[in-house]
A protein has these predicted regions:
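A hydrophobic, multi-pass inner-membrane permease signature
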Residues: 1-270
Length: 270
């Protein structure tokens, strides 16, 4: 009986947490179909309208904001993976007494508030003439996501059976061939989940984009923030813009859900 009640309590707790996390998204989706008047004085009884979506999509430079988000997120994700894969491979298969210290130091950088390094990063970007450029965002996003990427790749590398590499060496494979032809195919599900996580982090990032860009390189997060200005807070349009920004990630996650689940459980059962 005790075990049954624990199971039920865990189920209720899980559903409560899930609903609490889903509620803001559901509320934003609901608000997106309201007029500004209905959104400002929240009501559940309203006539749905697509006016907010229409105004957001027809707003000047929207395709540019969308293109910037796609470019910055994709490029920074690929760069972070390109650096993290050999780094994680080297730390997992050729560790030394400082490997764990390096990993902990990299992880500790994620605990530093971004505002603490805003001024030096801004001055560096200004000196290098990179303000309001995609290059600046790509560099910052790549460096910001690199610790997570290295940690995840390092973990996946440790979960790969060493016997596979011993067999490859017996067949005459060198280090490069082990990495490309043995390790990468084996940990592909893990890399897929890592790539999706990095893409989501880059897509959702707002702090650096708001401080390092204005118009030319501004992503969708800046576009969404523009609906909160001195003239007021336009809840319906802000919600519509947020829903449109969330949609690509939801679709991508749905399409890659099989790889994502396999990646999250990679190495759980050997």
């Amino acid at each position: 009986m005790t075990s049954t009640w624990r199971t039920r309590l865990a189920g209720v707790l899980a559903w409560t947490i899930a609903l609490a996390l889903f509620f803001p998204i559901a509320w934003a989706a609901l608000t997106a179909f309201k007029t500004e008047q209905d959104a400002y004085t929240p009501t559940l009884l309203f006539t749905p309208t697509l006016d907010s979506f229409r105004e957001v999509l027809e707003r000047a430079h929207y395709p540019s904001f969308l293109g910037n988000s796609l470019a910055v997120s994709a490029i920074s994700t690929l760069l972070a993976l390109a650096i993290a894969i050999p780094a994680g491979y080297a730390m997992a298969f050729f560790p030394n007494r400082r490997t764990q210290q390096v990993l902990l130091w990299m992880l500790s950088t994620k605990m530093m508030p971004a505002v603490g390094v805003l001024l030096p990063v801004y001055l560096l970007a200004k000196t290098a003439w990179l303000l309001d450029s995609i290059t600046a965002l790509v560099i910052v996003y790549t460096l910001a996501n690199l610790p997570i990427a290295v940690w995840m790749v390092f973990t996946y590398c440790n979960d790969v059976p060493r016997e596979i590499f011993e067999a490859a060496r017996m067949d005459g494979a060198n280090l490069w061939q082990e990495l490309v032809y043995v390790l990468l195919p084996t940990m592909l599900p893990g890399l897929a989940s890592t790539a999706l996580l990095l893409l989501i982090l880059s897509w959702n990032e707002a702090f650096w984009s708001l401080n390092l860009t204005s118009i030319d390189a501004a992503p969708l997060t800046v576009f969404i923030a523009s609906y909160s200005n001195p003239e007021g807070l336009f809840w319906a349009k802000l919600s519509a813009a947020s829903v449109l920004a969330i949609a690509p990630i939801l679709v991508l996650g749905w399409l890659a859900q099989r790889q994502l689940v396999r990646g999250l459980t990679f190495g759980a059962v050997k």
